[in-house]
Amino acid sequence: MSNAPAASPAILLAMTAVTGVVDAVSFLAMGHVFTANMTGNIVLLGFALAGAAGLSVSRSSVALIAFLVGAVGGGRVTLDVSGDRWVSRAFLMEASLLALSAALAIIYPRQPYAVIASTGVAMGLRNAVVRKLGVADLTTTVLTLTITGLAADSRLAGGDSPRWQRRSVAIVAMLAGATAGTLMVIHTISLPLAVCSVITAGCAIAHMQINSDRRQL
């Protein structure tokens, strides 16, 4: 992963907050699925297969398949890591998919599958890109290892608490995103997705600017 361009932790923390919003929307407004957190989605799929009330095999399956499609696309995007523009392009692709999701939520307010699919593709794409970047403790969609590291590497556990600030902020970022997403989705599905699109586009522009400044040094 050393050939990948540098990514600002601040940008990835913003993307982590976006994840919280997206999963709040998908779980609360699209039939109890996760389109970003595939660990949770697989668990929900298992519950649905066992006949748990309020869950759907088809919705969870669509989320999983869409995520895989996005991850394949993200893998293709990351094939050429000789420059740094591919990261911004990928983030702009994600922003476009989230904007599409917001539009679909307006056009098909009672049909969640299109929004599940578009947000799933967006999150799969993002995961493939962030995986290639390989920034420690900032996967942007999963916090299990981050929380484990925070505890297992703490002074209480005999460690020296490396990157505890980054780990803590990542947890807070996703928590804040989930809270904000919940507050917004009470009123409309499209608004939080539109906000996510704008934030992600801003992250793409910020990444372009940061790496442009680095090239000029």
Question: Where do the PLM segments sit?
Answer:
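Alpha-helical transmembrane segments of multi-pass membrane proteins
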Residues: M1-L217
